[in-house]
UniProtKB/Swiss-Prot annotation:
Full protein name: ATP synthase subunit alpha, mitochondrial
Keyword S-adenosyl-L-methionine part of the UniProt annotation: no
Swiss-Prot/TrEMBL site (Required for activity) positions: S382
Complex and partners: F-type ATPases have 2 components, CF(1) - the catalytic core - and CF(0) - the membrane proton channel. CF(1) has five subunits: alpha(3), beta(3), gamma(1), delta(1), epsilon(1). CF(0) has three main subunits: a, b and c.
Record key words, sorted: ATP synthesis, ATP-binding, CF(1), Hydrogen ion transport, Ion transport, Membrane, Mitochondrion, Mitochondrion inner membrane, Nucleotide-binding, Transport
Keyword DNA-binding included in the entry's annotation: no
UniProt function note: Mitochondrial membrane ATP synthase (F(1)F(0) ATP synthase or Complex V) produces ATP from ADP in the presence of a proton gradient across the membrane which is generated by electron transport complexes of the respiratory chain. F-type ATPases consist of two structural domains, F(1) - containing the extramembraneous catalytic core, and F(0) - containing the membrane proton channel, linked together by a central stalk and a peripheral stalk. During catalysis, ATP synthesis in the catalytic domain of F(1) is coupled via a rotary mechanism of the central stalk subunits to proton translocation.
Binding site for ATP: G188, D189, R190, Q191, T192, G193, K194, S195
GO cellular-component term (any): proton-transporting ATP synthase complex
């Protein structure tokens, strides 16, 4: 149309129009053939580098999130900013070897890692390489190369959560049931026992070992990670666990990539029809790492200086946790993201984002922790949106009454400090509430089998513990558990109680257990 307008304006004869049109097409074809974009767009050159971020020219057709290699430096990076004349790239490693003029090569793919069953019992870095000194990981027939950025399972591939994911923590399994394929946020201030609940859940899978556990340490101290690995090894849980580590001394891009690497490993087992549990410890540090990268890339800051897409980096990660249906192997990936709050403020930007993404949250309070209530779970602010759909028949029956009793206790406990003239009913509710809280206390790294959990909840709902002094409750609980373990028939029943399809709260075996112990 432009050529026709020019011809009309210059009064060129109509008969010569076709000749000019053919000539124009030829010139355009030659120009397109020799344009700089098509001569070479696979290599670029570093223009400048600062604080782990480089500007590169020449990579005109690179895609966002694409992996690049710094030629001859044994370093990789990822393209995050696509600008008119340059590309903003973050470096995965130390930037001391990078300088102006270094050649950058496109890898024409996103970051990918090799995943296999041989990773079980190992400690790996963000790139999937072992860092535990136990030798290299060898490829096998089942080894798969998987991109760390993968699409979440679609709607038709999913199935509703209905299988229980037992944590071994009485308070969680009874009041906040978690299912396989669920995303349950663990949130609270620093030093309130967030990681302890997640680690207990890993230790509790030792009973049947049908769940592969992945622990992702984001921005943690090396000494903390070492203690965790040693504890898992001592308890015999490391053999079914994979630890993905990006410590506080690692560059921000490595801390940013760590959860996606761990999720990819979990998806490998989920797609094989197995069940996996992944712990992200913690996503607050993950968000801070992404904020650091974004500010260095000169992206516009938003609320609390986080970039506008900080919600998306967490939603696309957590949506990958799912329960698949029969057509896709019935596998599941359960996620326990951990978020740290400041002075109990759950209305901050990152906590509210992740609360809106997940299927419930376990809220831990500093005040409860300081009172000696461990785990320091605030049952009123905590919720599991899956509910009793993922609970066994036994726990469903027993926990229903427990929730009501605790709700009544919380309501009356507020007024207890203002008035000492309570009636007999109120006094009884307060006494039973204190007893229940005492029995729900549990030490770290000591998960309890579901049968024993059910027995203790049954015992606290009857008169066996009612007349005990609160200071003696924990000791009496230990004696009862020891007695059940010593009687083979009781121990066998407790071991298979989770499989019971129908349960009567006045079950004769549970009653017999308690009566036999009292005698």
């Amino acid at each position: 149309m432009q050529l026709e307008r020019i011809l009309t304006e210059t009064n060129i004869e109509r008969s010569k129009f076709k000749q000019y049109k053919v000539l124009s097409k030829y010139i355009n074809a030659v120009a397109k053939k020799y344009t700089l974009n098509n001569v070479s767009n696979k290599y670029g050159k570093v223009l400048f580098i600062k604080d782990g971020v480089v500007k590169v020219s020449g990579l005109s057709q690179i895609k966002i999130g694409e992996k690049v290699e710094f030629v001859g430096k044994n370093l990789f990076g990822m393209a995050l900013n696509l600008e008119a004349t340059s590309v903003g790239i973050v470096i995965f490693g130390e930037d001391t070897a990078i300088y102006e003029g270094v050649i950058v090569k496109r890898c024409e793919q996103n970051f990918a890692i090799k995943v296999d069953k041989t990773m079980l019992g190992r400690v790996v870095d963000v790139l999937g390489q072992p860092i535990d000194g136990l030798g290299e990981l060898k490829d096998t027939k089942t080894t798969r190369v998987m991109s760390v950025e993968r699409k979440a399972p679609g709607i038709v591939t999913r199935k509703s959560v209905h299988e229980s994911m037992l944590t071994g923590v009485k308070m969680v399994d009874a009041l906040l049931p978690i299912g396989r394929g669920q995303r349950e946020l663990i949130i609270g201030d620093r030093q309130t026992g967030k990681s302890a609940i997640a680690v207990d859940a890993i230790l509790n899978q030792q009973v049947n070992k049908d769940i592969v556990c992945i622990y992702v340490a984001v921005g943690q101290k090396k000494s903390t990670v070492r203690r965790l690995v040693e504890m898992l090894n001592t308890k015999g849980a490391l053999e079914y666990t994979i630890v993905v580590v990006s410590t506080a001394s690692d560059a921000a891009p490595l801390q940013f990539l760590a959860p996606y690497t761990g999720c990819t490993i979990g998806e490998y087992f989920r797609d094989e029809g197995k069940h996996a549990l992944i712990v992200y410890d913690d996503l607050s540090k993950h968000a801070v790492a992404y904020r650091q990268m974004s500010l260095l890339l000169r992206r516009p800051p938003g609320r609390e200086a986080y970039p506008g897409d900080v919600f998306y980096i967490h939603s696309r990660l957590l949506e990958r946790a799912a329960k698949l249906n029969e057509k896709y192997g019935c596998g599941s990936l359960t996620a326990f993201p951990i978020v740290e709050t400041q002075a109990g403020d759950v209305s901050a930007y990152i906590p509210t984002n992740i609360i809106s993404i997940t299927d419930g949250q376990i809220f831990l309070e500093k005040e409860l922790f300081n009172k000696g209530i461990r785990p320091a779970v605030n049952v009123g602010l905590s919720v599991s949106r899956v509910g009793s759909a993922a609970q066994s028949a036994v726990m469903k029956k027993l926990a229903g009454a427990l929730k009501l009793e605790l709700a009544q206790y919380r309501e009356l406990a507020r007024f207890e400090q203002f008035s000492s003239n309570a009636d007999a009913v109120t006094t009884q509710i307060l006494k039973k509430g204190k007893l229940t809280i005492e029995l729900l206390k549990q030490v770290n790294n000591n998960p309890m089998a579901v049968g024993m959990e059910a027995l203790m909840i049954f015992a606290m709902s009857t008169s066996y513990f009612q007349n005990l002094d609160l200071s003696l409750v924990r000791a009496e609980e230990a004696k009862l558990l020891q007695y059940i373990h010593s009687v083979s028939s009781f121990k066998l029943y407790a071991a298979c109680v989770d499989a019971v399809k129908a349960f009567n709260p006045k079950d004769t075996v549970f009653t017999e257990m308690c009566q036999s112990y009292v005698k």
